[in-house]
Each structure stands twice: as structure tokens, then as C-alpha cells.
């Protein structure tokens, strides 16, 4: 393995010791079938010291494992380098040399937000470090007793914006630090309107399983997807515009 590119290691998180749903198994299977020369590493409570970080400890004790992974994914990439994938990310084709030669790579989730479902970086990347440092003195439990449900997508998008990146969904580069790809590369599924923007440039698809949400909420999402398949995603967009009016 060359030392001057992002290591061929896939990091993913699975905390809580529950059985993986079929969709998750299907996605992980796609990694193994397509990324045949990659090491795949699962981060869980047997591997990572839950008590090593206050935010992680509090989130774990609340059973909010998705928020545990918010920290652990960044910890893993910073300390070891490689590619982090959410468990509901399906890989479509092998990451190119162009992708792996970046200091770090990211993709847009929607036009105004950076995705955290697929992140790649060389070890000790400075942007990853800036992201990681935000969790060092952060509490998951607020002073009033509420939990902090600020998403890592919101957090990292603000960091990127401060660095001068335009949150407009276009390809952008910060030399020596990161490259940001359009939505079609790593997260082509439009979860708001339920249609796919997949193209020949697509490496991965984030299916937005949203395991941290209540079952009733996920069921509503499934119904919405079913309706979208029947009437078409573009028609969902039109309906939303009519409702907004």
C-alpha cells in the first residue's frame, strides 16, 4: 500500500450489539464484493473505549448510538486514515485513484449541506482534526437535561463554510486539505423528495435508513418512498411546491 494516498481501509460503526437489519447487511455485502482489496474494520464497544470521551459516554448511556458514531468515525479516520461509511451506504464502484489521492474527500448531501455518510482522508488530516476537536469538550447532555441532537452534518457544514467553501453543491477544492464533490458522487438519493440523482459518477448511495429515529417515523418514511415509487420522485417535488404555495 502506498503511503501517499488514502489507505484502503473501510471504517464503520455498530454500537449497541443488536442484529444488523437486512438493508445494512446488503450494504456491507456490497463493500466486500466491490472493494475486494480493502480492509473492513467495525468499530464497536468492544474495540473503542466508550469512557474516553464525555460526549460518547453520555450518548452511549442514553442509547443514542448514531451520535456515538459521530465522534468515533472522525476519531478512526484521523488516527488511522481510510474511508468511513455509514452502514446504510451501498457501494456502486471502486474508489478511483483520483479520489484516493486527495488529502480528504467529502460530498454534498443536499445542495446546502456536506454529507458525513462517506468520508475519506489520509491519517492526521487537518480538517478531520478540526472536526474531531469540536467533540473534545462537548457534552451530549445539556445543562437543562435535554440531549444535544445537533447533527454532524450541520456541524461539519459550518466548519466548511468558515473555510470559504460555498455550500452550493458544486465541486470545490482546498489545496492540501480537502476536495468536495457534487451530490451525485456519494449521496445521490434525494431523501426529501424520494428520487435518485445517480449517474456514471456515483461511487456510493446513502439510503438514509435513519436507525436512530423512532420506528413510527421510519414507517412514515417507508410509506413516503413507496408513494414516490408509484407516482415518481419528480412528481413528489411538484406536489411539495404546490403545498408550499
Residue spans for each PLM region:
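Glycosyltransferase-associated regions of secretory-pathway enzymes
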Residues: 1-69, 85-245
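Small-residue hinge/turn detector
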Residues: 71-82
Amino acid at each position: 500500500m502506498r503511503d501517499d494516498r488514502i489507505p484502503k481501509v473501510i471504517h464503520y460503526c455498530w454500537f449497541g450489539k443488536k442484529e444488523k437489519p437486512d438493508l445494512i447487511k446488503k450494504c456491507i455485502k456490497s463493500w466486500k464484493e466491490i472493494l475486494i482489496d480493502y480492509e473492513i474494520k467495525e468499530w464497536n464497544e468492544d474495540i473503542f473505549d466508550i469512557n474516553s470521551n464525555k460526549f460518547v459516554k453520555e450518548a452511549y448511556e442514553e442509547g443514542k448510538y448514531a451520535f456515538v458514531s459521530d465522534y468515533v468515525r472522525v476519531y478512526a479516520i484521523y488516527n488511522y486514515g481510510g474511508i468511513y461509511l455509514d452502514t446504510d451506504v451501498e457501494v456502486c464502484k471502486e474508489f478511483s485513484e483520483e479520489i484516493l489521492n486527495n488529502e480528504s474527500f467529502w460530498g454534498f448531501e443536499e445542495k446546502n449541506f456536506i454529507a458525513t455518510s462517506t468520508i475519506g482522508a489520509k491519517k492526521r488530516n487537518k480538517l478531520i482534526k478540526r472536526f474531531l476537536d469540536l467533540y473534545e469538550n462537548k457534552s451530549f447532555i445539556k445543562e437543562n437535561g435535554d440531549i444535544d441532537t445537533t447533527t454532524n452534518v450541520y456541524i461539519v457544514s459550518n466548519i466548511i463554510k468558515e473555510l470559504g467553501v460555498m455550500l452550493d453543491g458544486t465541486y470545490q477544492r482546498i489545496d492540501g486539505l480537502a476536495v468536495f464533490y457534487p451530490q451525485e458522487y456519494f449521496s445521490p438519493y434525494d431523501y426529501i423528495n424520494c428520487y435518485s440523482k445517480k449517474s456514471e459518477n456515483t461511487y456510493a448511495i446513502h439510503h438514509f435508513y435513519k436507525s436512530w429515529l423512532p420506528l413510527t417515523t421510519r414507517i412514515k418514511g417507508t410509506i413516503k418512498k413507496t408513494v414516490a415509487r408509484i407516482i415518481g420522485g419528480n412528481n413528489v417535488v411538484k406536489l411539495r411546491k404546490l403545498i408550499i404555495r
